From Swiss-Prot:
Any Pfam family hit: Metallothio_2
Keywords for the protein's UniProt record, in alphabetical order: Metal-binding, Metal-thiolate cluster
PANTHER family for the chain: METALLOTHIONEIN-LIKE PROTEIN 1A, METALLOTHIONEIN-LIKE PROTEIN 2A
Organism: Zea mays
Name of this protein: Metallothionein-like protein 1
Taxonomy, superkingdom: Eukaryota
Gene Ontology MF annotations: metal ion binding
Source species taxonomy: Eukaryota, Viridiplantae, Streptophyta, Embryophyta, Tracheophyta
Function: Metallothioneins have a high content of cysteine residues that bind various heavy metals.
Similarity comment: Belongs to the metallothionein superfamily. Type 15 family.
Length: 76
């Protein structure tokens, strides 16, 4: 059974499950070079911010991308 969990579940760029705007799909016919203009050291987030972000994300809604690009569990 397939499920679309809506905007509360985003399963990544290669997955159609739960996209906010499913009609807007990124397509490209030509290879575009990536240009990096500057380099900076990686910023580390404080542990309390990482924990708060994990609690408020998709996992808090009980929705993640399962096998076959379906929302798992399908409780939307």
């Amino acid at each position: 059974m397939s499920c679309s969990c809506g905007s509360s579940c985003g399963c990544g760029s290669s997955c159609k499950c739960g996209k906010k705007y499913p009609d807007l799909e990124e397509t490209s016919t030509a290879a575009q070079p990536t240009v990096v203009l500057g380099v900076a050291p990686e910023k580390k987030a404080a542990p309390e911010f990482v924990e708060a972000a994990a609690e408020s994300g998709e996992a808090a809604h009980g929705c993640s991308c399962g096998s076959g690009c379906k929302c798992d569990p399908c409780n939307c």
